[in-house]
């Protein structure tokens, strides 16, 4: 991941002083230390969503890691209005809140890739799914058959029309 020069700089150590009652206080030495998280059009998805979009090479390394651990990769996709957890697109069994991340379902691209040992197979399926649904969110999830749980999930494609994402430099005000 390549960060901008501004992001790569370490933050200055804040100056610690004691107030009249003996409590430690800090004084922000730079404006960057007092920034506020941008709550609008700054949505995140699962693992790695705080990073800039992953390159094909970075996705390939993640796929290799998944296969090295004998996990089962699976592609899922969703339209932009169905991708985020919300009251409109969640399946409920009674009065359940929609804040739990798995309380919504994405459409599975084909079947999970059971027994897949070649990362290029996964990458070609990502390309095929992207070609078929260019304006959909596409994520790669992986499952551990021994523990019977989802291990990880991350976006491999964000639609070009998406306006709900901010670059790391624009995430704070």
Curated annotation (Swiss-Prot):
One of its GO terms (molecular function) is lyase activity. Residues 1-33 form a transit peptide. Its main location: plastid. GO terms for biological process: photorespiration; reductive pentose-phosphate cycle. InterPro entries: RuBisCO_ssu, RuBisCO_ssu_dom, RuBisCO_ssu_sf. One of its GO terms (cellular component) is chloroplast. It comes from the Eukaryota. SMART domains: RuBisCO_small (SM00961). Heterohexadecamer of 8 large and 8 small subunits. This is Ribulose bisphosphate carboxylase small subunit, chloroplastic 2. It comes from Acetabularia acetabulum. The gene is RBCS2.
């Amino acid at each position: 991941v390549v960060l901008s020069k501004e992001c790569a700089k370490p933050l200055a150590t804040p100056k610690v002083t004691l107030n009249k009652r003996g409590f430690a206080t800090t004084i922000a030495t730079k404006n960057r230390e007092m920034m506020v998280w941008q709550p609008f059009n700054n949505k995140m998805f699962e693992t790695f969503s705080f990073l800039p979009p992953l390159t094909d090479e970075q996705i390939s390394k993640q796929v290799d890691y998944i296969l090295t651990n004998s996990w089962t990769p699976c592609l899922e996709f969703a339209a932009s209005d169905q991708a985020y957890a919300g009251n409109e697109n969640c399946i409920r069994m009674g009065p359940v809140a929609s804040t739990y991340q798995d309380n919504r379902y994405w459409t599975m691209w084909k079947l999970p890739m059971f027994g897949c040992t070649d990362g290029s197979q996964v990458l070609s399926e990502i390309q095929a799914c992207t070609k078929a649904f260019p304006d959909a969110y596409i994520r790669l999830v992986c499952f551990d058959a021994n523990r019977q749980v989802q291990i990880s999930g991350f976006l491999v494609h964000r639609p070009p029309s998406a306006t709900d994402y901010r670059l790391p430099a624009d995430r704070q005000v």
